[in-house]
């Protein structure tokens, strides 16, 4: 009887500690849990896309995109700006850089600009020194060796979603600018767009209407991965990917970035066989396929359509005044 009483007394003291340790272990494991589905499921129409290769998990891990892991970045930091270009786009890129400097010159709200080198020569990089030294522009080289060889085909734009994902590991929000994007005028208040985006359920905003449907400029094979019904794709306008705003929220990582990066990694998702950039539009730019493909832009539009339950008002910026305009050299 005495031994039994001693045992029960010890158990009464030990059990709470044991439960605490078990709960802490389970909690720790749950926080690290990064289970991932490898095929996109369209819940509205009960359609499942072609599965991506699980080989890409290591890269997803490196970009914090493997599952439901929570972002540790402070949301209080203002969005920074990110761009990327090769030497053949340096001329238009210098206009973009100058417009960025001019726009923020008289503003108290200073912002960081990171430029990714995706094919600059030594001389090209020297030409950027002016912006690095005087305006704090940061220049990074994109590490192509971490990714499949076909990333080096710059016209397939696989590098764009990966660069955006890389930077969103460090910063809570980013503006993406193509090298051809320049600020339209100094009176535009980007903070209005940032506030609007931060209030969305999936905090990604596209800004420029392309005046044709997603269907018209998306290779049919991409729909195998992101199962949007053809009739829906014909009614949805494609929005340009030349300037976009992203917040590093869990919903953005799960619903958009993870799949966008997977598409970039999967050879025939981002660039289906026989895909071509040049379009042959008919007078009806919504209901007829223009025999072309917009690569990263097609993918982000499909993903945003799916994430918003096919309501572009959730991600297409509603105000008419342009934030940037595109001027290609």
Across the structure, where does each feature detected by a protein language model lie?
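Glycosyltransferase catalytic domains, chiefly GT-A lineage
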Residues: 2-329
């Amino acid at each position: 009887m005495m031994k039994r009483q001693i045992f029960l007394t010890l158990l009464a003291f030990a059990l709470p500690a044991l439960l605490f340790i078990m709960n802490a272990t389970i909690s720790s494991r749950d926080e690290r849990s990064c289970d991932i589905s490898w095929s996109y499921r369209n819940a509205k129409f009960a359609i499942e896309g072609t599965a991506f290769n699980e080989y890409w998990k290591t890269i997803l891990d490196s970009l914090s995109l493997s599952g439901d892991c929570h972002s540790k970045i402070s949301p209080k930091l203002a969005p920074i700006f990110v761009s990327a270009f090769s030497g053949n786009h340096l001329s238009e890129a210098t206009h973009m850089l100058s417009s960025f400097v001019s726009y923020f010159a008289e503003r108290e709200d200073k912002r960081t600009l990171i430029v990714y080198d995706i094919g600059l020569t030594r001389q090209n990089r020297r030409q950027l020194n002016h912006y690095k030294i005087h305006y704090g522009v940061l220049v990074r080289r994109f590490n192509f060796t971490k990714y499949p060889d076909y990333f080096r085909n710059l016209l397939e734009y696989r590098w764009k979603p990966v660069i955006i994902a890389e930077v969103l590991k460090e910063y809570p929000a980013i503006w993406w600018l193509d090298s051809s994007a320049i600020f339209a005028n100094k009176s535009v208040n980007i903070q209005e767009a940032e506030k609007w985006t931060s209030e969305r359920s999936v905090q990604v905003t596209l800004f420029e209407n392309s005046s044709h449907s997603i269907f018209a400029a998306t290779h049919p094979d991409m729909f195998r991965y992101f199962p949007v019904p053809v009739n829906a794709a014909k009614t949805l306008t494609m929005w340009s990917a030349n300037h976009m705003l992203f917040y590093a929220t869990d919903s953005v990582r799960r619903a958009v970035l993870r799949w966008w990066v997977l598409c970039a990694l999967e050879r025939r998702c981002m660039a289906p066989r026989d895909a071509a950039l040049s379009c042959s539009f008919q007078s009806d730019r919504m209901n007829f396929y223009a025999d072309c493909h917009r690569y990263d832009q097609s993918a982000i539009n499909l993903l945003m359509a799916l994430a918003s339950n096919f309501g572009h008002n959730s991600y297409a910026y509603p105000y008419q005044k342009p934030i940037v305009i595109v001027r290609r050299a």
